[in-house]
């Protein structure tokens, strides 16, 4: 596809923003969805201080900034900061003029109508996009796996959803949301490490814990069994070197942390785990399509990257499903970015080119056009 007119694909997650060009097989830019503002005016003398920083720059200067996430639980809650993130995406990360490229954005399942309209309005009025489309994240993940029917468990940093999809359409009545995701697991690991006598208190230190989580945590196939193994020997222990050179040891925390996905009571939440939520979602669907859903359970998002998670899901859902049911868990290696990849695939399809909302259509109908063209 000609780079001049390549569509831009932006997947705005609660934790990370993934952006790039339609037709590429991976996003060109992946950066934290954060906006930072100086805690104290004029601390950094002669640094030419800006009033706000976005993404990696905010992350690296986090010591002197207050960091805010404009996307909470998958939903945009702060539009001024969101605009800053989009501006940064176009001009600093991708280095493109947004008025020259169609823009595909992603949205959380069950995103409020007013939010879709606001996104549409900002893209056309602030950034002058020539064409625009918004697609549901889980649907894109399913496309990326080469399917049009299945149930997607999409778990990122801020929220998890189970989304049953039939022939390319999400079934809204059966979508379930679980407010338990990567950020909560990081917080839980902080608590577990605290009990071990390793205090991590500042936002900067939480980032270290996030790294520990990503590098060392895994999902146990049998939690009780694993706890016994951990108690009896040190074979499950790993060490981690902190930035200051101190080395800490982490044992059963490695699998206790992600176990909260299956047992939210660990976090004090009265919610069903990801396996049960997936099952409940399937049970809200028509009897006739359940077999297709059980046979196509697709994992998506960074919080599904733990080793052992697919086997555990297989075990749990098989025990919930009817005994003769064939259960298949699909865990693509690139699932951290599968929403973005699905967007890249969709936006470069020749059949999709008639689906864009054009600037002209927007000017004639206003923001509500998004409900007619994007579903």
UniProtKB/Swiss-Prot annotation:
Give the UniProt subcellular location, in the record's own words: Cytoplasm, Cytoskeleton
Its Gene Ontology cellular component terms are: cytoplasm; cytoskeleton
Molecular function per GO: ATP binding; hydrolase activity
Keyword list, A-Z: ATP-binding, Cytoplasm, Cytoskeleton, Hydrolase, Nucleotide-binding
Q: Which InterPro entries match?
A: Actin (IPR004000), Actin/actin-like_CS (IPR020902), Actin_CS (IPR004001), ATPase_NBD (IPR043129)
Where is it mostly found?
A: cytoplasm
Q: Which Pfam families match?
A: Actin (PF00022)
Q: Which organism is it from?
A: Phaffia rhodozyma
The record's comment on protein family reads: Belongs to the actin family.
What is the role of the protein in this entry? Actins are highly conserved proteins that are involved in various types of cell motility and are ubiquitously expressed in all eukaryotic cells.
Keyword Hydrolase attached? yes
EC number(s) on file: 3.6.4.-
This one is known as: Actin
Concerning Gene3D superfamilies, the annotation shows: 3.30.420.40, Actin, Chain A, domain 4 (3.90.640.10)
Reactions that this protein is recorded to catalyse:
ATP + H2O = ADP + phosphate + H(+)
